[in-house]
């Protein structure tokens, strides 16, 4: 079925959840980076908060003084259907997505509207695939989850790295991420929601596996293994049980360029073994506490949604992801790096993902797709122009 024609809609792009911590950062980035003539709007539950945000944006970007404000609520599916029907691309920062996300995904899938989010919740993404993939494919909607620090640096970083290796050969990539950044209440809330549901997460993954096509004649793996010592990066690698390896594997399954036999492993890179062990134990303790309702409420209360690191703290933050790759007799190390990953750079990644969907000449895709599949090199170029670095460290 051909993609729905959305060119006559009122807006090119709508940002939903604009008044939250990450949403406001994304709005500020868009205010200074949307191309001339872009028709965009802010959306959320509270008109008063949207007006306050618009006033702040207009102080540095006077053109925002007349920015349209749209009221919508995740508890009112009708308002979300109207939102989706009025725009070509809909960006949402409203989480936890397991709690608030599905009505908007459903609305976009039905309307043929491109959808972009920051979701790092594997269960949610798997459930959305099972429930809305067919509808989105039929309408032409591109449903692009994980368009922030989860999982853009890894997804595009591996695509960039694979492009430097010979074609048609088995490829191995190990990713090592290092950062000094803090996190917000919204991020903590989403992480605790996901960590508290291991059984439901496993069930959603099995349901997806039953219906999702597998690559024919090719092997794609993203195994979870023990800690490793990397001589190339001079770090210990602590396996990270995050969404990112799944996203990388889905890109590899969709793109033949990743070779006939592709494997990706994902680690937190730390300099000293005691830190590696402590980090693994700490993550395990948080996951265990998340199973206990009273402990989960206590952890959630450490930061309220809408809270986050100060501008000064974010200015000191950084991330680096090194990829150790081999294939066809070639071995190399690449790196993706930038500033504050959780907020400043995430807002940049999310906004540029939406702008790429709205304005770039992209491959024809539909349904639930990754950033590497939907936007690929176009988004990598955008992020490089915006200051996120992709490069070869060692060949």
Regions found by a protein language model. Name each.
Residues 2-6, 163-395:
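C-terminal catalytic/substrate-binding lobe primarily of soluble NAD(P)-dependent oxidoreductases
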Residues 12, 88-89, 114, 332:
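Structural motif
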Residues 12-31:
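N-terminal Rossmann NAD(P)H-binding glycine-rich loop of SDR-like oxidoreductase domains
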Residues 29-37, 255-256:
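A short, Lys/Arg-enriched amphipathic alpha-helix followed by its capping loop at the start of a domain
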Residues 35-49:
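Conserved glycine-rich Rossmann-like NAD(P)H-binding loop of the short-chain dehydrogenase/reductase
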Residues 53-64:
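Short, conserved SAM-binding/catalytic segment
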Residues 70-89, 93-99:
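Conserved Rossmann-fold cofactor-binding substructure of NAD(P)-dependent oxidoreductases
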Residues 97-210, 243, 250:
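Glycine-/Pro-rich loop/turn segments that contact NAD(P) or position catalytic residues
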